[in-house]
């Protein structure tokens, strides 16, 4: 049980996909201008990353390894992610049309989010079992969502703050992301994996 708790805390805080591994920076910078879109993107990404991790582990364990098709792993995972994203898009369109309009082009772009493919590939490379793969995917998504929501809240405050002209816009956003990364480095001694 403690192994799963350490995996969760380690993935969310210590080895955060955005601030430590630098995966998923495109949606991190692109969707984080408003808190509500960041929350929606975080929820959609959480669903996709968790489901994609589970499906990728199942396909790798039951199809690719037994048939000795490991060289097709990346292609198979990209196809799995595309199917999961299409399923998520249909669910979001039916359940929340407002969120669907707010996310706009970013929802289909989850397919190309390197964090989703990264979590699927890292699951296999780290040798996780089924439960660890599901938890790792969920934890990575929770960490991604946490950072995205925190960053969106900070960016909303920065939008009305008196920022010097050369630092307005993306410049202050990158500085803020760097400071967040430094803050998350404080968790580095928390969990030893």
Swiss-Prot record:
Enzyme class: translocase
Transmembrane domains' residue ranges: 5-25, 39-59, 63-83, 102-122, 134-154, 171-191
Known EC number: 7.-.-.-
Alphabetical keyword list: Cell inner membrane, Cell membrane, Electron transport, Membrane, Translocase, Transmembrane, Transmembrane helix, Transport
Membrane topology: Multi-pass membrane protein
A Pfam family per the record: Rnf-Nqr
InterPro entries noted in UniProt: Ion_transpt_RnfA/RsxA, NqrDE/RnfAE, NqrDE/RnfAE_oxidrdctase
UniProt-annotated location(s): Cell inner membrane
GO biological process: electron transport chain
Signal peptide range in chain numbering: none
Residues on Cytoplasmic side: 26-38, 84-101, 155-170
Gene Ontology cellular-component terms listed: oxidoreductase complex; plasma membrane; plasma membrane protein complex
Domain of life: Bacteria
Ranges facing Periplasmic side: 1-4, 60-62, 123-133, 192-193
Primary location: membrane
Subunit structure of this chain's protein: The complex is composed of six subunits: RsxA, RsxB, RsxC, RsxD, RsxE and RsxG.
Similarity field: Belongs to the NqrDE/RnfAE family.
Function text: Part of a membrane-bound complex that couples electron transfer with translocation of ions across the membrane. Required to maintain the reduced state of SoxR. Probably transfers electron from NAD(P)H to SoxR.
UniProt-recorded name of the protein: Ion-translocating oxidoreductase complex subunit A
């Amino acid at each position: 049980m403690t192994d799963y708790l350490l995996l969760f805390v380690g993935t969310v805080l210590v080895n955060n996909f955005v601030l430590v591994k630098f995966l998923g920076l495109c949606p991190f910078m692109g969707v984080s201008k408003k808190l509500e879109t960041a929350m929606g993107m975080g929820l959609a990404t959480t669903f996709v990353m968790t489901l994609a991790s589970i499906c990728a582990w199942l396909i790798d364990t039951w199809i690719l390894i037994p048939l000795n098709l490991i060289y097709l792993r990346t292609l198979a995972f990209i196809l799995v992610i595309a199917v999961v994203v299409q399923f998520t898009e249909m669910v979001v369109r039916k359940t929340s049309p407002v969120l669907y309009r707010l996310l706009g082009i970013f929802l289909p772009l989850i397919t190309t989010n390197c964090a989703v493919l990264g979590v699927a590939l890292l699951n296999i490379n780290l040798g996780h079992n089924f439960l660890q793969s599901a938890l790792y995917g969920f934890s990575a998504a929770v960490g991604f969502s946490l950072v995205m929501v925190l960053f969106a809240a900070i960016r909303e405050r920065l939008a009305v703050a008196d920022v010097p002209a050369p630092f307005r816009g993306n410049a202050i956003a990158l500085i803020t992301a760097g400071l967040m990364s430094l803050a998350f480095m404080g968790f580095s001694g928390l969990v030893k994996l």
